[in-house]
Amino acid sequence: MFWKPIVNLLEAEDIEFLVVNAQHIKAVPGRKTDVKDAEWICNLLRHGLLKPSYIPDRNQREMRELVRYRRSLIQERSREHNRVQKVLEGANIKLASVVSDIMALSSRDMLEAMVHGETDPETLAGFARRSMKRKKEELELALKGTMSSHQRMMLKTMLTHIDFLNEQIIELDMEVAKRLAPFQKDLDRLDSISGIAPGTAEQILAEIGTDIASRFPSAAHLCSWVGLVPSHNESAGKRSPPKHVKATNISDPHSSKFLTP
């Protein structure tokens, strides 16, 4: 992100600037120097041929960073859950075959007991709550394993890391909610769309902002910007098969796509 420090300085001095995709301003092949490149860019600017990339204001950029960082922590937490499952499998403990979430309250109590040295399947199954109590026999069979001191240490470290990630995610949730409070009506409208959860609504607002009309003349422009429009390539009267633009992260202003599964 070489453009960010410069943009921050220019923005602080209230100087108008353009961030332009380098692929859109390539000069004619030949002798290439920094001076010639500068002259070429100046000529393009004088003739109005520079197409600026969309650079949100500082508030929205900060909002994007918060939402993206939260997303990365959530993904890391999921990876840590998978590591816990791998440790359990290595200890021949098949907890996931009985419970749908090994990080639910009952399962977490069982894991904590394992960390503290508990190995008796009946005792571990006794931590089951509510509907899980009906699966006590299955739990006892699934919890018959052999956990070494090494695996116990690994499990303890992973659970500690998960707790830390949970705390950080909650803190980010609070900050995101505070910053988006003035746009609650927009969030509610997005949340009313089938398939869009509150977290997704927050991400959409953070990425495209609320002043969409000033940036995108139509819905088609917005769809193209996020990479949902097939490309159209034609040469000598022949059309190549359409391909959707690959959606990437818009932390790069020249690769301004953000919708990911």
Regions found by a protein language model. Give the residues of each.
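A detector of single, family-specific signature residues
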Residues: 1-261
